[in-house]
């Protein structure tokens, strides 16, 4: 009897270590239960990519790897360019908080990587780097590199150098969402599930730089004045914006022709000059559209988007549509709601501007849609979410919606648009009425 009680205590203790929900993870818990190491993972062409690997102290059960690839900062860095990574410094990246905590709570190996040419990662960065490896993905024998081959090489290293169960998940929002799409195109067999969220997809037809071919000056001019810059060498510091617009945007741009704006940047923004020299939807833009290559995708895919996303609403729904069309056998899921860009990453999100749509919609998305999706496909545990989960705008008056949980308003469908749905034309009338 004592042996049974002892066995029960050991099992309960080992399971309990990872049984908490992500909302309960604290800095102290993370430091007690995770180690961090910073490595420079070699790619096939010799370039090395900065990678922060967070590994659970307990190795009682092999767990999956959750990978996020990003061009944005992963501060704090434990070393400077030209130095060797320090093994003694533990400082978690802000990327560990928010939408990754469920995976930390469950003991996943969490990996954050700066893509080629950003921060401490070597070689040159290229905006929405063209997909050159084609159907072969990372298995290509051509002497080329792209985001698919870099993902493939990263996964190979992770499988060999971390304790894991052999399954990899990849997720990301906005630009990292683009890299999640490229992970599916890497064709690595260990990548079982990916989630492109508000993914940069087509910078001409609808995402960031253009909307239906119309140049989005405000977005490009401010975001691009840092993102489109070329760095001189690897660094822990990002590129500063060249411009800061403090006045009214309309007044700022209305009196300036595009040539004047371009002249201000000169040769400092090579991608800006390329972009404005391709005013039509030509090969330059099509080469940078990953959705055109989404054929015969094998990993399960959860696409996430916000109806009020001003940056990459197009990318989410176009990615979903292209996967339905080009990869009908893919296990495809969609989650969408009345969110701004990346709004679902916040557990407490309940409104946008003056419109309210239910409390804690981000919490429901993270706990009841995204996490179960990855857990099912990476561990074979739990149940899959519905194929389509949508939180409609519905009633938006604060007096009626504040305090009501969003769980009451989510709708589930088998596909999107829903079967038997009929389109309705909406017209803007005088006095700004619909």
Predicted ranges, named:
Residues 1-21:
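Bacterial Sec-dependent N-terminal signal peptides
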Residues 22-24, 32-37, 42-47, 189, ...:
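Alpha/beta-hydrolase-fold serine-hydrolase catalytic core, especially in secreted/extracellular enzymes
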Residues 45-55:
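A short loop-to-beta-strand scaffold at the N-terminal edge of the catalytic core in hydrolase folds
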Residues 67-159, 347-357:
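Cap/lid segment of the alpha/beta-hydrolase catalytic domain
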Residues 89, 93-100, 105, 127-136, ...:
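Accessory cap/linker subdomain of secreted extracellular hydrolases
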Residues 163-174:
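Alpha/beta-hydrolase fold nucleophile elbow
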Residues 171, 195-198, 335-338:
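Alpha/beta-hydrolase-fold catalytic nucleophile elbow
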Residues 173-182:
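Glycine-rich nucleophile elbow surrounding the catalytic serine of serine-hydrolase chemistry
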């Amino acid at each position: 009897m004592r042996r049974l009680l002892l066995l029960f205590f050991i099992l309960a203790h080992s399971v309990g270590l990872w049984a908490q929900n992500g909302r309960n993870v604290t800095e102290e818990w993370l430091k007690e239960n995770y180690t961090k190491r910073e490595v420079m993972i070699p790619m096939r062409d010799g370039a090395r990519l900065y990678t922060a690997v967070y590994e659970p102290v307990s190795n009682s059960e092999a767990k999956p790897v959750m990978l996020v690839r990003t061009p944005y900062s992963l501060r704090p860095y434990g070393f400077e360019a030209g130095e060797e990574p320090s093994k003694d410094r533990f400082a978690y990246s802000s990327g560990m908080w928010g939408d990754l905590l469920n995976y930390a709570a469950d003991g996943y190996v969490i990996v954050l990587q700066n893509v080629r040419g950003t921060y401490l990662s070597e070689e040159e960065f290229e905006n929405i780097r063209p997909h050159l490896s084609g159907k072969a993905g990372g298995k290509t024998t051509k002497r080329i590199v792209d985001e698919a081959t870099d993902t493939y090489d990263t996964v190979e290293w992770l499988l060999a150098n971390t304790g894991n169960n052999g399954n990899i998940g990849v997720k990301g929002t906005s630009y990292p969402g683009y890299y999640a799409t490229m992970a599916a195109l890497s064709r690595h067999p260990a990548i079982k599930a990916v989630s492109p969220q508000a993914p940069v997809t087509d910078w001409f037809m609808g995402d960031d730089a253009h909307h239906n071919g119309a140049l989005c000056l405000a977005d490009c001019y401010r975001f691009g004045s840092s993102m489109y810059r070329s760095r001189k060498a690897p660094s822990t510091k990002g590129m500063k914006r060249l411009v800061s617009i403090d006045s009214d945007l309309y007044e700022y741009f209305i009196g300036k022709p595009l040539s004047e704006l371009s002249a201000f940047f000169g040769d400092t923004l090579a991608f800006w000059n390329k972009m404005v020299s391709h005013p039509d939807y030509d090969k330059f833009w099509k080469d940078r559209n990953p959705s055109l290559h989404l054929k015969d995708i094998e990993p399960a895919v959860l696409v996430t988007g916000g109806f009020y996303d001003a940056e990459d609403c197009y990318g989410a729904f176009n990615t979903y549509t292209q996967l339905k069309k080009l990869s009908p056998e893919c296990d495809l899921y969609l989650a969408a709601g009345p969110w701004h860009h990346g709004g679902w990453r916040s557990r407490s999100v309940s409104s946008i501007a003056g419109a309210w749509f239910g409390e804690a919609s981000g919490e429901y998305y993270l706990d009841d849609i995204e996490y179960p999706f990855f857990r099912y496909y990476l561990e074979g545990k739990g149940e899959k979410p519905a194929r389509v989960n949508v939180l409609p705008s519905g009633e938006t008056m604060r007096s009626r919606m504040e305090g009501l949980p969003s769980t009451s308003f989510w709708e589930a469908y088998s596909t999107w648009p829903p079967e038997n749905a009929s389109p309705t034309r909406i017209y803007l009338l005088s006095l700004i009425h619909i």
